Structures are given as structure tokens and as C-alpha cells.
Regions:
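Methionine residue identity
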Residues: 1-5
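Non-heme Fe(II)/2-oxoglutarate
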Residues: 6, 12-15, 22-111
Length: 161
């Protein structure tokens, strides 16, 4: 497997993200934020223009809490507890692979930790989700039996296109 070494400086608009950090940290009843222009515009446009097309590789979860088409990156298995692994996925564009690699980098995790004030060491899952007419996601928790100190979903990042 070949993982390209890339320059990540033109992907994420960290200045804008950090400018919204205090809002995230102080929102009630829990920390949350909404950041416009998360990506630099050129990089966003590349991601948008190469967003994966819906085909037979997408699936629909069968539980009653959601109905939306999903596609996982690489060899991820939606039915396992395996953490996300940095890898190339030739079914996605070079730009999506670059972003996926960057999300696994120390720089990305350190910056998201700085933004959120939550120490992050990795992430669990990465998926594409398409909500069409009739799609839904019910309010839910991913691991309702875990104690807060053990909770594996410390930060959820949703990027909309």
C-alpha cells in the first residue's frame, strides 16, 4: 500500500475553526459548534466535485433509528468495532484520499483537540452519508451503556456538502 506524503496547508481553514473555539466550548447543554468555511474554498470544491456517486457499494442501515444511504472508506466494516485505519481507497478521488490521510495525522488531531478542549488520539469511523427524501436519523447515542469517562465518541464531526 502506498500512502502519499502531501502538503495539508490548503485543506482546512484552521484560523476560522479556532475563531469559533470558544463558542463550541461554552455552548449549553453540551459543547457544540457550527463552522462555515471549514475547508479552504478550492479544497472544498474539489471534494464537492468528486463526492462519491451512489451505486451498489452504498448500503442502508437496517435498524429503526435511521434510514440514509452510507458508504465506508477503504476496508472499514460497519458491523465491527475496528477503529478507522489510515489507508488508500482507489474508489475515491485523490482529494478524498488526501483528506482521509490528513484526518489521521497528528496535526489534525492536535488542532481538533485545541478547538474542542478534548484530548483526541484518533477517530472511530469515517463514512459518507446521503440523505434523500424520506431519509431520517432519530436522536440516538452510539454506546448508551458506557460511562462518560469511557465513552468512545468524544467528538463527532459532520461536514455537509
Amino acid at each position: 500500500m502506498m500512502i502519499l506524503m502531501l502538503s495539508y496547508s490548503n485543506m482546512i481553514n484552521w484560523e476560522n475553526i479556532f475563531a469559533n473555539s470558544n463558542t463550541f466550548k461554552n455552548n449549553k447543554p453540551f459543547p457544540y459548534g457550527f463552522i462555515e468555511n471549514f475547508f479552504h474554498e478550492d479544497f472544498y470544491n474539489e471534494l464537492y466535485n468528486t463526492y462519491p456517486k451512489i451505486d451498489e457499494s452504498w448500503y442502508v442501515p437496517t435498524d429503526s433509528t435511521r434510514y440514509a444511504k452510507k458508504k465506508w472508506f477503504g476496508t472499514a466494516n460497519p458491523n465491527s468495532d475496528q477503529k478507522s485505519v489510515d489507508q488508500e481507497d482507489p474508489s475515491f478521488s485523490r482529494t478524498w484520499n488526501q483528506f482521509f490521510h490528513y484526518m489521521h495525522s497528528k496535526e489534525f488531531l492536535d488542532n481538533m483537540s485545541k478547538y474542542s478542549d478534548i484530548v483526541l488520539t484518533g477517530f472511530n469511523h469515517f463514512s459518507f452519508i446521503v440523505n434523500e427524501k424520506g431519509s431520517f436519523n432519530m436522536p440516538h447515542t452510539h454506546h448508551p451503556t458506557e460511562q462518560k469517562k469511557d465513552y468512545s465518541y468524544n467528538l463527532t464531526l459532520l461536514v455537509y456538502f
